[in-house]
A protein has these predicted regions:
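Central antiparallel beta-sheet cores of small beta-barrel/beta-sandwich binding domains
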Residues: 2-154
């Protein structure tokens, strides 16, 4: 779990749209559980979803996690979305944590099942403590500037 724990950027690609999520993978040694928690932003850096991952299965030999997630979209906060996600991490340098990964998640819309989508994702680790602090505690304008900058540089 130590290979993947930490703060991550996730580029989310769907036909005609790209967005970004900033999230954290936490490992609780006492309960031996992994949790994910993040916020997604559109291409303009506006927040559009909050989500958390649970029931995370780590498959160490494949550098892979599979998880269930639940969340809300800001425009339909009364509607709960959920799904399953999977991420495979690129092999890290010796003695280093993973730095990149890729995968997909399924965004299930129970109110309109025909809108359920599979979304491809790419991950890159964020190790700059200042960026992490700004994303977790900074002003909305700071988060917007960071998300658009990271997405444009991807």
């Amino acid at each position: 779990a130590g290979q993947v724990a930490g703060d991550w950027w996730e580029r989310i690609r769907t036909p005609g749209a790209t967005s970004i999520s900033f999230f954290r993978i936490d490992y609780d040694e006492a309960s031996e559980t992994i949790r994910l928690r993040g916020q997604a932003y559109d291409a303009n850096g506006e927040p559009w979803a909050h989500w958390s991952g649970f029931a995370v299965e780590l498959v160490p030999e494949r550098r892979r996690i599979v998880y269930r997630w639940t969340g809300t979209h800001t425009e339909t906060a009364h509607t709960q979305f959920h799904g399953i996600g999977e991420v495979e991490f690129d092999p890290p340098a010796a003695g280093q944590p993973a730095q990149r990964g890729y995968g997909r998640f399924w965004d299930v819309d129970e109110a309109r099942p025909e809108n359920t989508r599979s979304k491809a994702v790419e991950l890159q680790r964020e190790s700059d403590a200042e960026v992490v602090t700004r994303m977790l505690q900074g002003r909305a304008a700071d988060r917007q500037a960071l998300t658009t900058r990271i997405l444009a540089a991807w």
